[in-house]
Amino acid sequence: MKFIDEARIEVIAGDGGDGSASMRREKFVPFGGPDGGDGGRGGSVIAVADRNINTLIDYRYAKKHLARNGENGRGADCYGKGGDDITLRMPVGTTITDMETGELIADLTEHNQSVQIAQGGAGGLGNLHFKSSTNRAPRQKTDGKPGERRMVRLELKVLADVGLLGMPNAGKSTFIASVSNAKPKIADYPFTTLAPNLGVVRVGPSRSFVIADIPGLIEGAAEGAGLGHQFLRHLQRTGLLLHIVDLAPFDDAVDPVAEAKAIVNELRKYDELLYEKPRWLVLNKLDMVPEDEREARVSAFLEGFGWDGPVFEISALTGQGCENLCYAVFDHISAHSDAQRAAEAEDLAADVRFREKPQAPAAADDAGTDPQV
């Protein structure tokens, strides 16, 4: 199935039905009075997150989604039937934005999470509501309200703990295939990966994290070169970025330092917040470097790149160094999660609305002695 991570659709909620202006006409009831019922409400448009869906392809060509209108009210105090709601099922990780106002309507981060994105119109009132002591046969009634109408943008941002960055053929897909059960396409030509891949890395019982591999970036991606930088949105929810560098390129004219700097520049052009995320350097394909040259090549790269953060040396093909990297990643994610939970608990404690009422001190006389009986 083709991977689609962005779509624009129009959602139109149903209009409310009109109220009825009807009079009761019945044998032996000379003054029946008003009996017009209310109109039914219009159907709403509801978005639901579904973990069994992983693309927005259903909304790439179905551009308009309409809910049913409410029925009009009728005589004999009969209310109109409400319009049926329609449900739009979307992948977990989808954000819904109003294109006119820029308002973020919903961020679907949990399975079965539902959000109303267009509300149906209210039904009109029948003339039964306008009866009074001075107006016993009202002819007034109200029309139903129109349903909400919106143009919305759907964006899918995959949910992952760790994201992989790197040039095409840096070994990102080989790495995710080595440490997880993901089966990405792997070949010796650029842009083998055309869509994000997710893999679950297990480091022990009940100890795992999710890793995301996106198509490779090249210099000028911000201007649309290669596949552009559209897939970088899938790294916005991650807590850690692994910058994978090919330390043994096939072409001797390729400069790993220049390529690594180009990746960082493209990251910064796309989103400053993404650029400031924790980022580790992973030097890959060390199995292709002679052992007596490894230390010198690594030192020369780090000096040229000007990097002073965490560095890991691995071979995704042979698995060398991958286990230690995965354990370090899990420890980082666990520590970050614990710190986040502690901060949330602190915020909650500071936001207590009802505190225990303090006890009033016991009354005593001015002299401090028991009162005389």
Curated annotation (Swiss-Prot):
Domain Obg, first and last residues per copy: 1-159
Cellular location(s): Cytoplasm
Please tell me one Gene Ontology term that the record gives under cellular component.
Answer: cytoplasm
Keyword annotations of the record: Cytoplasm, GTP-binding, Hydrolase, Magnesium, Metal-binding, Nucleotide-binding
Residues bound to GTP are: 166-173, 191-195, 213-216, 284-287, 315-317
Instruction: Give the Enzyme Commission number.
Output: 3.6.5.-
- For the ligand (Mg(2+)), the binding residues are 173, 193
Q: What is its main location?
A: cytoplasm
* Covalent S-S links between cysteines: none
A single Gene Ontology biological process assigned to it is: ribosome biogenesis
OBG-type G domain ranges (all copies): 160-334
Biased region (Low complexity) positions are 359-373
- Cofactor(s), names only, from the UniProt record: Mg(2+)
Looking up Gene3D superfamilies in the UniProt record yields:
GTP1/OBG domain, P-loop containing nucleotide triphosphate hydrolases
List the GO molecular function terms: GTP binding; GTPase activity; magnesium ion binding
Q: Give the family, as the similarity comment puts it.
A: Belongs to the TRAFAC class OBG-HflX-like GTPase superfamily. OBG GTPase family.
Tell me, in a sentence or two, what this protein's role is. An essential GTPase which binds GTP, GDP and possibly (p)ppGpp with moderate affinity, with high nucleotide exchange rates and a fairly low GTP hydrolysis rate. Plays a role in control of the cell cycle, stress response, ribosome biogenesis and in those bacteria that undergo differentiation, in morphogenesis control.
Give the quaternary structure. Monomer.
Q: What is this protein called?
A: GTPase Obg
Q: Gene symbol?
A: obg
